[in-house]
């Protein structure tokens, strides 16, 4: 006998994630973030991610940060418990730019009414 998926599970499987969403950093800069499934996203290398609970960023960083920085690792563990969404952040590879983006996104908020191209 085949198990039937609940209505909510079927809706989740059918509904694709939005293409990109806009967030405004504390500096006023806009970022087009790519939504990821929280239950299946993977920290890989120096790829940057933002974990949020609603409209509040709870952690911004990469696998490199989790591995090499005890404070970031502790914040990441707490963020996994609290977060209800994850976003991939497209950022340049140089360290200064990456650190600046992390700082900026830690105080970011989603922007309604703008469409990311």
Show the residue positions of the predicted features:
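Canonical phosphoinositide-binding patch of PH/PH-like domains
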Residues: 87-92
């Amino acid at each position: 006998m085949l198990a039937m998926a609940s209505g909510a599970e079927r809706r989740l499987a059918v509904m694709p994630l939005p293409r990109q969403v806009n967030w405004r950093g504390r500096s006023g800069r806009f970022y087009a973030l790519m939504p990821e499934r929280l239950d299946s996203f993977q920290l890989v290398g120096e790829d940057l991610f933002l974990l949020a609970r609603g409209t509040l960023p709870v952690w911004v960083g990469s696998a490199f940060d989790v591995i090499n920085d005890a404070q970031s690792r502790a914040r990441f563990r707490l963020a996994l418990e609290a977060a209800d969404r994850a976003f991939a952040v497209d950022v340049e590879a140089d360290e200064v730019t990456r650190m600046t983006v992390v700082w900026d996104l830690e105080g970011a908020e989603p922007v309604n009414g703008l469409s990311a191209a």
